[in-house]
Amino acid sequence: MEFVRALWLGLALALGPGSAGGHPQPCGVLARLGGSVRLGALLPRAPLARARARAALARAALAPRLPHNLSLELVVAAPPARDPASLTRGLCQALVPPGVAALLAFPEARPELLQLHFLAAATETPVLSLLRREARAPLGAPNPFHLQLHWASPLETLLDVLVAVLQAHAWEDVGLALCRTQDPGGLVALWTSRAGRPPQLVLDLSRRDTGDAGLRARLAPMAAPVGGEAPVPAAVLLGCDIARARRVLEAVPPGPHWLLGTPLPPKALPTAGLPPGLLALGEVARPPLEAAIHDIVQLVARALGSAAQVQPKRALLPAPVNCGDLQPAGPESPGRFLARFLANTSFQGRTGPVWVTGSSQVHMSRHFKVWSLRRDPRGAPAWATVGSWRDGQLDLEPGGASARPPPPQGAQVWPKLRVVTLLEHPFVFARDPDEDGQCPAGQLCLDPGTNDSATLDALFAALANGSAPRALRKCCYGYCIDLLERLAEDTPFDFELYLVGDGKYGALRDGRWTGLVGDLLAGRAHMAVTSFSINSARSQVVDFTSPFFSTSLGIMVRARDTASPIGAFMWPLHWSTWLGVFAALHLTALFLTVYEWRSPYGLTPRGRNRSTVFSYSSALNLCYAILFRRTVSSKTPKCPTGRLLMNLWAIFCLLVLSSYTANLAAVMVGDKTFEELSGIHDPKLHHPAQGFRFGTVWESSAEAYIKKSFPDMHAHMRRHSAPTTPRGVAMLTSDPPKLNAFIMDKSLLDYEVSIDADCKLLTVGKPFAIEGYGIGLPQNSPLTSNLSEFISRYKSSGFIDLLHDKWYKMVPCGKRVFAVTETLQMSIYHFAGLFVLLCLGLGSALLSSLGEHAFFRLALPRIRKGSRLQYWLHTSQKIHRALNTEPPEGSKEETAEAEPSGPEVEQQQQQQDQPTAPEGWKRARRAVDKERRVRFLLEPAVVVAPEADAEAEAAPREGPVWLCSYGRPPAARPTGAPQPGELQELERRIEVARERLRQALVRRGQLLAQLGDSARHRPRRLLQARAAPAEAPPHSGRPGSQE
């Protein structure tokens, strides 16, 4: 292995290059250069353009890789002015330093360009001019030292594009109209060299005209005489800006086809007032200026690298230039040597392919578009792309070379064809003309109602002289009329239009063809344009163009309105959504309760300690109120977490109910059911049931197909068919319907469905019998191939798609916007489920009331007797109060005997308004309220401090304080003479008060037993204070010690 490696190294040393590794001179040349090659630059004068060019040059100088790792150094020429003397001195100063290989300039005017042209030839220094303005005329003979790169469209390239467009249209004799041209003779000579033949007519429009009349007079030589042809078939307008070109084109006479030679962007192209068929061109996808600067620097660097491989000294060390003493530098100067390599350099740059022709013209990739002014499907003028030119190759769109000049005024050179059509929406519509008998839109057509040839000839003759009956005049428009107008413009031909007399497509009846086919065979019409299906039977007797519309047969049915079921109001949401909403409601209520009772700020006994608490029933009430937008009083959570969760639940309910409301109207209008048919092979069609009727249009392609393929079906449907498509649709939508299904071309059925305002029509089943619509012509007609070619071009160019979008772009059923006066009426049947739900709610309320009474009378006493389940605040405040505060129903049997004493009984029976209570009453009321709160909270500890009790005992007694029901102060004692029966009434009242006191004492014992002994003393002192005044009467009952 070591031997093999040594042998390989020896062969490499013996066969490899010498020790120099290149040219023997580079070492000395590099030492003199100092590691860089200089490139002079004459920058623009404008500050922004100057900064932009300097930045682009600085970036471009870093990109190229020169031989021997040399760099590119820029030497900027800065003349104080741009007059010839100052410009020459500035350029000469830039060429004085040694090593300046070439000069890069940005001339802004033609004098600068000429001065650079002469300076480059005098000094034999390569000068590369980057032209940023529009096309200019060439500078005479090519100068090998002055290379020009046009960033804008060069004149030579522009003329090449125009010549290619003229040759594509076979226009040989051309007229030129020149605007603002400094050298008309040079431009004409350049045109002759590019086109191969001189222009037939040249008009100089450089002089300004005072008005349109003078401009028309100067353009008159281009006009076509009356009844004759124009002197030239095409005219080119060159050198005009957009404003001047518009004035000229608005004044051009009829005759030639005009081409706008000024390149314009698409957005700057005008449309109004210009002649139809005008051709224009413009450069698209122009590379940025920085890319052009990069490529021109790259051109110099590549040429220097190639020259340095041959003669490094001559390529990299050019002699300094002395403009004051120009001496010849031998047979080939360094500048001429470098120019030779510049002229033979080509590469792929940032702008695309870059190459040099004629030793002075630098080319980069160009892309032009050719536009034609035509009319869109709506009749408005619009620019349409008809071709594309790239690097010398013109590619025309289908139909792009079909544009022909309009006929001159008064000339009748085009053939006039008689066209028959048939009303079939949306392909052909008809309406009455205006008051003047004219059609503001569409084409004037006749509705003769007959197929007699003599009658048709007489009617069209009367129409020509304006004496045709007004009742027979119609305005025809639609899909096929737009197609016919486009064909008449492009072919070209004139036409006169009429509606077929019998209103039929055509079928063989008794050995004769009817309808459209019959008119073509009889010679009454030269062309039939409508939704004319191509089938084998018709193709045997007439010719068809290539199909312009593809369709099939379809089946249309009508919807049947059915009554909404009881649960229709729940249809807007799926059952799983309803279940999820109510599950989320109860879960949210549970979390609201948990957060509120766990919070130190909640509405609970341990939180805010209010007289009300937030329980689970409160949470449910709140969640249901938010969900159904009820404006009822409900407790709200007080803790921040609960409020946040409550707001989130409100957002959830808002979105759910908004979706429900949005879908409610669409769902509750009633269900629509359709006749289910799978297609033409459905058993309902082949074996129709009693009362099932279906049909088609007489003598149509659909009837011919069914008659040929399904004779039995045709025998059944024959008596139910209709004369026209609209009549068949009317039979389907009548009430009661006369048809259950209608079979016809799917393109026609789809249009009927799209315009159905009631949304009752639908096409069902799979399409069958694929067919196409074509233009019918007599057999061996010379127009068949031409029209077929144009139709194919229209398909590929997108014109057919535009027609389809124009006439089929209808608002689909179910998505239309209703008018202000239109309403969706919903009957009582739509709300039957809601009424049933309300009745169920009333029944549920009755059951809930019975359950409430059962719980209060049966379950509550059992819970009260037990020692568990006594704390219900977190669930229901009412149940908790019933267990811990309210006396049970029927407790009279459990009470002990107790005698009521004092005037308390009399005070509780007062019904009249009472005076203001004294201060002692207020203190006692506050004490009772506090005692009630302690009992409500079920706290075993005494809430009143001992110090407060001592102070209360030590304070002077203000007299007895009586507490009456409803918080009212006691009434004044009666005075005066006794009344009859007053003693008996008082005794009765005393007995009632004694019974109530006995019940209160029993309840007090029960509470003390539940709360424990620690809470005995404070309530006892309070009750003793209340009962002290009542001990005075001798019959007042038991002493207070026996409580």
Curated annotation (Swiss-Prot):
Source taxon at top rank: Eukaryota
Residue numbers spanned by region Involved in the trafficking and surface expression of NMDARs: 979-1012
One GO MF term attached to the UniProt entry: neurotransmitter receptor activity
SS bonds (residue pairs): C439-C475, C445-C476
Residue spans, topological domain Extracellular: 23-574, 662-832
Effect of R470H: Found in a patient with schizophrenia; uncertain significance
Membrane topology: Multi-pass membrane protein
Stored Pfam families: Lig_chan, Lig_chan-Glu_bd
Subunit structure: Forms heterotetrameric channels that contain at least two GluN1 subunits and at least a combination of one GluN2 and one GluN3 subunits (in vitro). Forms heterotetrameric channels composed of two GluN1/zeta subunits (GRIN1), and two identical GluN3 subunits (GRIN3A or GRIN3B) (in vitro). Does not form functional homomeric channels.
Protein name per the record: Glutamate receptor ionotropic, NMDA 3B
Organism: Homo sapiens (Human)
